[in-house]
């Protein structure tokens, strides 16, 4: 069998890119260009439509069908980023972005990501990169102390923390640990009887995690919430559902209360839910993906009261903690449950440090083997801004949300649909002549002798929902602001989530002016027939 003669297969290449792919001087030159490019982008980000205006498939029509045979210059590539990629971006860092939840960025977060990516280490166990492992444990304890988590969640106590990519990963890992802990007691043949509980407001990540973990889809419970409890999960309702399941021969396994639901930022009562769960030996995981960060502020800490009774707690630092995607912080009281459920120990990974049991091997705290050096960017954020400034950044967003809430509340054409808890306001535009039926004929004569059609509550709801769908669509079409919607308790409402790092009060005022302008337009041309079909 002949050997390969590499000289025979080397091909001629143009000058661009002929240097080593990791040449330090070329890295310096191109790196400066990228930094300048991004700095200009953030300087000018307000000039772009917040939501991309392109049609599906736009990019395939504009880029070649095959990769370039010869290298191209960074200058050419950045020109294409400007002309082809940026038009297809929805600008999540725009100060006029109020959709979904924020994905807040910061200089420290970006630079921390640059360091992490630049080192490009694979820290699956302590031996593979000791600094990556140890820094992660340190920053998770720092952050846990900022949240005033009990020592049972910290490495300095009896627990510990790990950086996952997303909430879905955090829930899947803890659910897997809960599943195995339970099945080791009752026998693995009973997996089909295990039940997972959330509310009808719980993030879909819980249902996805349950599917992946092998929970019978029929045994996933989205417990109904009610307006009387601000759409939080009532412990009494949870108990009723659990008792019904036990009567049916099922086994309660896992419940996931939320601090700041996606639809309305509702807060489930952690303490009472933990009391119920404890009676039935259930694992309690607290999903504080959005609002958990706010709990570093003393005035918001009470929202996670009861965390000491739960088993695990997670939040997304990439949402509202200026740390850039992806960075989900997960704390657990019993790390051994995670390790037992998730560890593998092939011969090629064996080493003295692991066998000493004096180190953490984070590969056993997550789904994948490889892992990124996420702790670097969180460390950069914590050090660059400090607790005081981080609290004040969060408070500024809450203050701006309060300003917006006041503007909406002062305009009788609008309604605040659920109480504001953090930095998101949920509201809707009301249809004209919103009056309740007070007579059998369904009409009402006002003081000016004008006859107005009266509507029952269901008709009113249908009409208001359709009106707000059209209204939001028109507002988004302007490109100047971006908001999204939710349906809670049957009510279609508009979500205004303040959280972009660049947002200032003037941007909030501008958003309100856009909303008022389009409310004037849609109401001036209002024809009930157009919204009733």
Swiss-Prot record:
<keyword id="KW-0210">Decarboxylase</keyword>
<protein>
    <recommendedName>
        <fullName>Tyrosine/DOPA decarboxylase 3</fullName>
        <ecNumber>4.1.1.28</ecNumber>
        <ecNumber>4.1.1.25</ecNumber>
    </recommendedName>
</protein>
<dbReference type="InterPro" id="IPR015424">
    <property type="entry name" value="PyrdxlP-dep_Trfase"/>
</dbReference>
<dbReference type="GO" id="GO:0030170">
    <property type="term" value="F:pyridoxal phosphate binding"/>
</dbReference>
<dbReference type="InterPro" id="IPR002129">
    <property type="entry name" value="PyrdxlP-dep_de-COase"/>
</dbReference>
<dbReference type="Pfam" id="PF00282">
    <property type="entry name" value="Pyridoxal_deC"/>
</dbReference>
<dbReference type="GO" id="GO:0005737">
    <property type="term" value="C:cytoplasm"/>
</dbReference>
<dbReference type="GO" id="GO:0036467">
    <property type="term" value="F:5-hydroxy-L-tryptophan decarboxylase activity"/>
</dbReference>
<dbReference type="InterPro" id="IPR015421">
    <property type="entry name" value="PyrdxlP-dep_Trfase_major"/>
</dbReference>
<keyword id="KW-0456">Lyase</keyword>
<dbReference type="GO" id="GO:0019752">
    <property type="term" value="P:carboxylic acid metabolic process"/>
</dbReference>
<comment type="subunit">
    <text>Homodimer.</text>
</comment>
<dbReference type="InterPro" id="IPR021115">
    <property type="entry name" value="Pyridoxal-P_BS"/>
</dbReference>
<dbReference type="GO" id="GO:0036468">
    <property type="term" value="F:L-dopa decarboxylase activity"/>
</dbReference>
<comment type="function">
    <text>Marginally higher substrate specificity for L-DOPA over L-tyrosine.</text>
</comment>
<dbReference type="InterPro" id="IPR010977">
    <property type="entry name" value="Aromatic_deC"/>
</dbReference>
<keyword id="KW-0663">Pyridoxal phosphate</keyword>
<feature type="modified residue" description="N6-(pyridoxal phosphate)lysine">
    <location>
        <position position="319"/>
    </location>
</feature>
<dbReference type="GO" id="GO:0006520">
    <property type="term" value="P:amino acid metabolic process"/>
</dbReference>
<dbReference type="GO" id="GO:0004837">
    <property type="term" value="F:tyrosine decarboxylase activity"/>
</dbReference>
<comment type="similarity">
    <text>Belongs to the group II decarboxylase family.</text>
</comment>
<dbReference type="InterPro" id="IPR015422">
    <property type="entry name" value="PyrdxlP-dep_Trfase_small"/>
</dbReference>
